[in-house]
Swiss-Prot record:
GO MF annotation, one: toxin activity
Tree of life domain: Eukaryota
Tissue spec. comment: Expressed by the venom duct.
Protein name, entry field: Conotoxin Cl1.1
Provenance organism: Californiconus californicus (California cone)
Family per record: Belongs to the conotoxin T superfamily.
Length: 60
């Protein structure tokens, strides 16, 4: 029975470590749609506008 508290503590540590690892992954999933302007860059060249991370501007 002495091992039971140790097992409980280990489970808590593992679950908290999983939450720490999972947190940034959730943030990355949420931020992924923001990278769309980079993907649309080729489309924007056709309209005479260049879009980068800093924003869009006229292309010459």
């Amino acid at each position: 029975m002495r091992c039971l508290p140790v097992i409980v503590i280990l489970l808590l540590l593992i679950s908290s470590a999983a939450a720490v690892v999972e947190g940034p992954l959730r943030v990355n999933r949420r931020l992924r749609p923001r990278k769309a302007p980079v993907d649309m860059q080729a489309r924007d060249w056709n309209w005479g506008r260049c879009c980068f991370l800093s924003g869009c501007f006229e292309c010459w």
